[in-house]
């Protein structure tokens, strides 16, 4: 059976760790002037993916 392909977009966005799957928040690249300081601060830390979405991400990352 051939090797399974890794979804390269997902590989760049998610990282498997012992605590779960880590990801960075969206909407933090540019045009941040309209966002409040509180909102930008809350988007700062990386987060762990919710359990309901783990199966879909793991399907895209077969070797993670």
Swiss-Prot record:
InterPro entries: Ribosomal_bL35, Ribosomal_bL35-like, Ribosomal_bL35_CS, Ribosomal_bL35_sf. One of its GO terms (biological process) is translation. Keywords: Ribonucleoprotein, Ribosomal protein. It comes from the Bacteria. HAMAP family: Ribosomal_bL35 (MF_00514). PANTHER family: 54S RIBOSOMAL PROTEIN BL35M (PTHR33343), LARGE RIBOSOMAL SUBUNIT PROTEIN BL35M (PTHR33343:SF1). This is Large ribosomal subunit protein bL35. The lineage of its organism: Bacteria, Pseudomonadati, Pseudomonadota, Gammaproteobacteria, Vibrionales. The gene is rpmI.
């Amino acid at each position: 059976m051939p090797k399974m392909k890794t979804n390269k977009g997902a590989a760049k966005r998610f990282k498997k760790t012992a605590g779960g799957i880590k990801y960075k928040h969206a909407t933090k690249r540019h045009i941040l002037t309209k966002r409040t300081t509180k909102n930008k601060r809350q988007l700062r830390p990386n987060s762990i993916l919710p359990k309901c979405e783990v199966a879909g991400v793991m399907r895209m990352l077969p070797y993670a």
